[in-house]
Amino acid sequence: MAKKSMKNRELKRQLTVAKFAKKRAELKATIVNVNASPEERFAAVVALQKQPRDASAARLRNRCRLTGRPHGVYRKFGLGRNMLRQAAMRGDVPGLVKASW
């Protein structure tokens, strides 16, 4: 189990990313726009750099919904490998069967 503080930190990052997503997209569009003047593009770069570090989606980490484990998380299910295995063995995941050949 991950510490509660780590789970809360990740939740806070998700909220920050959602809050700044629209503004970040506008600034990035201005930066790559070849028709914009160099001054406008530079101002957009500076404004993007002044945003909080956690506003970037690259800082998000996929975590298991049950345990908060940061590694071995399956995106499709949102569960860590251990919890996914337990859920599959209990039959909680429809269509998921143990491989045998």
From Swiss-Prot:
- One Pfam family assigned to this protein is Ribosomal_S14
Q: Which InterPro entries match?
A: Ribosomal_uS14, Ribosomal_uS14_bac/plastid
Q: Which UniProt keywords apply?
A: Ribonucleoprotein, Ribosomal protein, RNA-binding, rRNA-binding
Q: Example GO biological process term?
A: translation
**Single GO cellular component annotation?**
small ribosomal subunit
Q: Does the keyword Oxidoreductase apply?
A: no
The molecular function GO annotations come to: rRNA binding; structural constituent of ribosome
Classify the source by domain of life.
Bacteria
Q: Give the matching NCBIfam families.
A: PRK08881.1
Quaternary structure note:
Part of the 30S ribosomal subunit. Contacts proteins S3 and S10.
Q: Which family does it belong to?
A: Belongs to the universal ribosomal protein uS14 family.
Q: What does this protein do?
A: Binds 16S rRNA, required for the assembly of 30S particles and may also be responsible for determining the conformation of the 16S rRNA at the A site.
- Under which name does UniProt file this protein? Small ribosomal subunit protein uS14
Q: Which organism is it from?
A: Pseudomonas putida (strain GB-1)
